[in-house]
Amino acid sequence: MYISDGEEKDIVPHFTFYGYRYVKISGVTNVSCEDFTGMALYSDYEGTGSIQTGNELVNQLISNVEWGMKDNFLDVPTDCPQRDERMGWTGDTQVFSGTACYLADTYAFYRKYLYDLYKEQLIAGGMVPEVVPT
């Protein structure tokens, strides 16, 4: 939210997203953490599998994997949401797809991605590109 003409307005970016752990705000005073809201963006899918152990460290690791999947499943499977590598890398997709299919119903997500891959293969003479879509 910002105020420039006397009226409060919310800022919600519609054409970009950022992955982050910390946010630094500068140039303003009298702000607190309660003045900000983070928003998790990810493709909609239903969770289908879960694991719970008696070890809190292992449970945290599993939670990190689940949130990592959410972080990287926004229209295409990416390898990291915080840098300019927010693209559908086919190698990363191949490595994580088994885990993803265990954790969630990924049928619609991967069907769309594999259709995009098929379209790229038509252009590339049947070769699988490193990134889909290119």
Question: Where are the regions a protein language model picked out?
Answer:
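Well-ordered alpha-helical scaffold segments within catalytic/enzyme domains
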Residues: 95-106
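Extracellular/oxidizing-compartment recognition motifs
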Residues: 1-83, 91-92, 108-117, 123-134
